[in-house]
């Protein structure tokens, strides 16, 4: 629910994003942050991105990505971006519906910030647990990995989404991990979003994951179920390679984070509203930790996941 399947940065917005992220690679043979190709290679980075990615440079047909090597994450587990804060033990619940083929079905999502971390591509990441229910039945549960860089931008480092049918686990074919099998991580939330900015959320050619986000509005006020939120940020997510997916419209408000999800176009539309924010106690966290660790172990059946270390409890 929180990360879709798309990616591209417009040349017009790239300069602004690069300024925020302390340097970008140039299209083609350039390097991130002004580093030489040799220096980038010695750091284990792609010459075109500056990030610790598979060799071979940026994917064909895309512009260069903002720099995001491990050296830019000195406190990656401190995710305090006001538009997407990830405090340990926080659980967000969203209620809404899925509309498909003219039919509407009840839909809900719980998103929990666990007390676990996971090393991904040289960076310690926050492990979040996302559970997606349709008509009360579990459809998908996902481990998502996030880290905040030194500029305050929150990055996607990978996902392990388990799919279910009739309550039975059917597989996790959309798993991706930054730096494995040609996968590139991307930005989940900018530190200083401004109207018109476009940014990548992730690019994984192997599973056709290709997310593009555009900041469409800032400083808005949105009222939901009697609660009014100020300084609301509106982001449009879409997939250039999949026109049938339409657009997902997300609303963020500080210091809460995501408060609403809407849709425009597409064969299947998701609508969600934040209904509760809880801070879980030790007993609940212990139970969640057990379930998430079990998922983490199951994930090692997938080749790209084996590039990571097992999730561990944060100190």
Model-predicted regions and their roles:
Residues 19-23:
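C-terminal motif of bacterial Sec signal peptides marking the signal peptidase cleavage site
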Residues 1-14:
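Bacterial N-terminal signal peptides that target proteins for export
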Residues 25-28, 33-37, 44, 50, ...:
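Conserved functional acidic sites
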């Amino acid at each position: 629910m929180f990360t879709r399947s798309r990616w591209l940065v417009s040349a017009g917005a790239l300069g602004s994003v690069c300024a925020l992220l302390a340097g970008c690679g140039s299209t083609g043979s350039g390097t991130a942050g002004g580093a030489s190709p040799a220096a980038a290679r010695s750091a284990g980075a792609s010459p075109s991105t500056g990030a610790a990615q598979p060799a071979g440079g940026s994917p064909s047909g895309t512009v260069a990505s903002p720099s995001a090597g491990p050296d830019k994450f000195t406190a990656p587990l401190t995710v305090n971006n006001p538009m997407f804060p990830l405090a340990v033990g926080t659980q967000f619940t969203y209620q809404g519906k899925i509309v498909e083929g003219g039919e509407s079905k009840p839909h809900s999502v719980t998103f929990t910030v666990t007390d676990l971390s996971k090393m991904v591509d040289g960076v310690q990441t926050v492990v979040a647990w996302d559970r997606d229910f349709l008509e009360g039945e579990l459809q998908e549960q996902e481990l998502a990995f996030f880290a905040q860089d030194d500029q305050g931008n929150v990055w996607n480092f990978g996902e392990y989404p388990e799919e279910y049918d009739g309550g039975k686990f059917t597989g996790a074919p959309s798993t991706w991990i930054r730096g494995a099998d040609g996968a590139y991580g991307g930005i989940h939330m900018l530190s200083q979003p401004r109207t018109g900015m476009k940014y990548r959320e992730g690019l994984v050619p192997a599973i056709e994951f290709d997310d593009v986000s555009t900041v469409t509005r800032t400083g808005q006020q949105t009222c939901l179920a009697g609660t009014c939120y100020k300084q609301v940020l509106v982001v449009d997510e879409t997939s250039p390679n999949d026109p049938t997916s339409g657009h997902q419209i997300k609303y963020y408000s500080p210091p809460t984070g995501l408060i609403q999800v809407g849709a425009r176009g597409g064969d299947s539309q998701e609508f969600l509203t934040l209904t509760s924010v809880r801070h879980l106690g030790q007993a609940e966290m212990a139970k969640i930790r057990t379930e998430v660790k079990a998922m983490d172990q199951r994930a090692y059946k997938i080749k790209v996941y084996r590039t990571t270390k097992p999730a561990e409890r944060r100190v």
